[in-house]
Amino acid sequence: MAKQKIRIRLRAFDHKILDSSAAKIVETAIRTGATVSGPIPLPTEKSIYTILTAPNGEKDIREQFEMRTHKRLIDIVEPGSKTVEALMKLDLPAGVDIEIKL
């Protein structure tokens, strides 16, 4: 029989919030008796936007902005019912996007 595994992907613009959320998830899973692999840092997506700042449409004056999306991956191997309940009740910051796959 195959082992049950929960894969959690976290995304955020601020890496400090992301790391603290990952630490909370890992601590909760270990406390309930599950085996944890991670958090594994995934490549950061960098989006660059170039905007013309000249009022008359001159091509020489531009301004660039960038947005970085940091990602982490956590695998929870052989989670019990206590682990799933604890993860459902866990309160994480609003800036973190969570994707869970069973």
UniProtKB/Swiss-Prot annotation:
Cited SMART domains: Ribosomal_S10
Family membership: Belongs to the universal ribosomal protein uS10 family.
GO biological processes: translation
Presence of the UniProt keyword Ribonucleoprotein in the record: yes
NCBIfam families registered for this protein in UniProt: PRK00596.1, rpsJ_bact
Function: Involved in the binding of tRNA to the ribosomes.
Subunit note: Part of the 30S ribosomal subunit.
Record organism: Symbiobacterium thermophilum (strain DSM 24528 / JCM 14929 / IAM 14863 / T)
GO molecular function: structural constituent of ribosome; tRNA binding
PANTHER family in alphabetical order: 30S RIBOSOMAL PROTEIN S10 FAMILY MEMBER (PTHR11700)
Lineage start: Bacteria, Bacillati, Bacillota, Clostridia, Eubacteriales
Keyword Cell division (UniProt): no
CC terms in the record's Gene Ontology section: ribonucleoprotein complex; ribosome
The organism's place on the tree of life at top rank: Bacteria
Protein's UniProt name: Small ribosomal subunit protein uS10
InterPro entries according to UniProt: Ribosomal_uS10, Ribosomal_uS10_CS, Ribosomal_uS10_dom, Ribosomal_uS10_dom_sf
Keyword vocabulary terms for this entry: Ribonucleoprotein, Ribosomal protein
